[in-house]
């Protein structure tokens, strides 16, 4: 497992997702997925998170959302 992600809140338009690039309990940031325009934004990045690794991981999170496997529980993600 590369890291984890989980939905932390959801309303009609926005889904907020906590994620970590590690398997531990630390949170590397929060994403906001916009259902209207289809974009994902990093709204609270970790100061120690590597930007290029984060961008690659966001692609994995997006794919998990499209498959319907991302939930309110931690979802393990790997490349």
Give the role of each language-model region:
Residues 27-79:
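Acidic, low-complexity intrinsically disordered segments
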């Amino acid at each position: 497992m590369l890291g984890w992600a989980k939905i932390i809140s959801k309303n009609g338009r926005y889904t907020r997702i906590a994620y970590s690039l590690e398997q531990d309990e630390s949170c590397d940031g929060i994403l906001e997925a916009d259902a209207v325009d289809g974009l994902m934004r990093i709204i609270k990045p970790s100061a120690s998170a590597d930007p290029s690794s984060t961008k690659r991981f966001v692609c994995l999170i997006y794919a998990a959302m499209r498959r319907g496997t991302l939930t309110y529980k931690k979802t393990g993600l790997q490349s």
